[in-house]
A protein has these predicted regions:
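Signature of N-terminal electron-transfer/Fe-S-associated modules in redox systems
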Residues: 1-156
Length: 156
């Protein structure tokens, strides 16, 4: 089957197998920030934006993305780098394997709710597994990022 989608701002048309996961499609196109973790939608490593909403690309068929926009961390370089610096500053990146999925979900949270409470942050990121147990540092990094963004916008 043939699909056409916009990946990180670039329109792509490809012939794909009907059972191809979106995860495999984006990785085949060089988007290696999207990780294969559990293949069961339990770890958050494969998070991408489908029309600006976070989805787990291991459980989404590429056919579902036909005609839509898909964004990976490669398409959010400036924003992801800004946010990633706050995670690193808190020592929460350790091995870094979980960072892309966690960053994608944290950015989605910030876009949906620019002033989340600590409980809202924890709830939103509950599906992101970190094998190094950096959760507290990640939480502090997110809170610091939000405070910085508000200051950038002149709200503090």
């Amino acid at each position: 089957m043939e699909v056409t989608l916009t990946l990180n701002g670039k329109r792509i048309t490809r012939s794909v197998d009907a059972d191809m996961a979106l995860l495999d499609f984006v990785r085949n196109d060089g988007c290696y920030s999207v990780k294969r973790g559990c293949d069961t939608s339990n770890c958050g490593l494969c998070t991408v934006f489908l029309d600006d909403k976070p989805v787990l690309s291991c459980s989404v068929l590429v056919a579902r993305a036909d005609g839509h926009r898909v964004t990976t961390m490669e398409g959010l370089q400036k924003e992801a780098a800004e946010f990633g610096a706050f995670i690193a500053d808190q020592g929460a990146e350790q091995c870094g394997f979980c960072n892309p999925g966690m960053i994608m979900n944290a950015l989605a949270l910030f876009r949906e709710n620019p002033e989340p409470s600590e409980d809202e942050i924890k709830e939103y990121l509950a599906g992101n597994l970190c094998r190094c147990s950096g959760y507290e540092g990640q939480l502090r990094g997110i809170q610091n990022f939000i405070a910085w963004k508000k200051a950038q916008q002149g709200e503090v």
